[in-house]
């Protein structure tokens, strides 16, 4: 049984029973996704216009509209397909895993591959992957509220269950979807997929959240307002043209086409694509985003609460010091005292302490392979191995009876083993938790009373080790149920990551407060914080000190502190709320099952990918696959970048749409001929709205992105003069297009040549404007134009389509264009270039006024 299934048997059962998954919602097929592009309201209007054209015999217009609709549908399909593929990759990466024994070897596999009969291992923080009967259990308890609605922890035991009346209340069964709160166990899978209790009573899908983000909803609302205004403008254009004597059909088509060209119907979709691309970019940098809305929120983060171990530090623990009552030892390749190698047999307390390292652990290490388990426990295991101890020999000689796994609340771990015909208990944990339990001390070869002077010496040793930035653990043992006998201390080095130091400096420049949270000793935390460059005159607070403050007092003084030591998960929750009371947007890291409430309460919950439990990962908005603070800071930078990029392409789309509306409306009101024909407006929409806007959403962060304070979440989207710039630029585009049209007529051009001149001016001015939108703080002439090859490619493709429409005889017939003479191309060039020059002049005037203030 303890060998588990063979790989072949597991494959056979997987074929027979299917994957360990609940029924999924049907995925969008490519054909259905493509046809879905035609359900858009704007497309419906275009198709209606096509029918009108056919009925009136305008076949050229009808075919042109259909071709453009098809092209738009293809572009929309490609964008949606790429977005769906990105989100599918995200779903696969967040799929749970399980520790399973196959062919006698423990391995980690996708939970979907589990089958009946598999032997699985469960530990605190795991999400149970399938219904399973406990084979062994050590202090295990589960949260089954997802099935029963009862939030109280349910203790579980291995062995046969006598009461079988209620399938959901069996003490020897753990159920798929429930969370292990404490303890550890091995269990045999008895049901998978839809045959589990979860599968029978629920069709809930554990899927990536893809609902609309707040920004998407705001922009969708904006789109509706703009659409309403455009419809009013279209009605005005229609009646003004008819009143002037233009053909009703022509004006009807013109009005409809203005609506199609001017209404930013693709705005929410473009935001979704930009967010999905940002998520994909973050994944490549080890930041896995669970929820799209967190991408926006990350950009507003003003406080990063980071765990010390593994996030700020390397999480590569190395035991450097061992202290017993009579001696202090250093550890490198062996155990040394004053530089000379020593044998543990010479020091009974040291030998017993190393036995505790070998037995009071859940870590495993096979020589020649990487150790498996918590970094702290593996460090202790390796230290004992350096002294000649073997984990396997110790387990065989002293069989395990019972284990109380490490708990973040109690900060200690305890095991009971058979020891020379009797029972012995080993204890390890935080010094301030272990020392008060002990009444005796192993001093040399004798057990003596742990006097107050001895206690003071131990506390002094803890202080000394902590001031060297070492993580300190204490060890004790007792025979049967006797008194606890203190053994000694270990000091472990876990230095700050170089990348974390740089990340903290970046946060300081970005006006983001970085706070270190740890369960370690206050002195250790302060030493690490000093090395990492975190303090800057701020102080440290312990969990005990935090408990003496009310919520109001904590919020009032919290800005004075950069380090919180000896804290538990409940303290984390209070810290999140205290920072939120100050108005800050809080990102909180966590890895344990008890961290889930704080992760959910934080504006951005961040779980650890390596050391994090499944419960923490599912509660989090973001998962750091490398447990690295610099990855979180990169995610914050990307959050700022994506918001800036969304502002950029909204600025681009709206100013272009305003330019098109101004061109058509002013032309009609000024008594000019219709400036652009419906097919020409559709061409404008095709070449300027799609690819350039998407490419603008792929801009890299601006150099000063992390030298600005975080954005306030309640800040209006059009703050900072964005709306004024959009309207002004739209007016410039419209006026210059009208000017080009008028100049072409004055130079003796035909109406078709004037319209072609206006068409080229309108499109080229918009393609130039896309480069202006790369920055809100620099004019076009001070921007790096070549650092986004996708934008360059999009503009090149759009310009190529325009020139083809002007030069190609077949396209000339479709879009009613004519080749332009050199004077008219000069008009196009001057009109298109005048717009960014005017914008740059206005930008300089505005910047000068701001400087004077």
Language model segments and positions:
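Conserved cytosolic headpiece of P-type ATPases
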Residues: 1-707, 717-718, 731, 745-746, ...
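Generic alpha-helical transmembrane segments
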Residues: 688, 733-734, 756-770
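Membrane-water interface at loop-to-transmembrane-helix junctions
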Residues: 712-731, 751-757
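A C-terminal functional module that forms or caps the active site or interfaces directly
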Residues: 773
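Long hydrophobic segments that form regular secondary structure
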Residues: 741-750
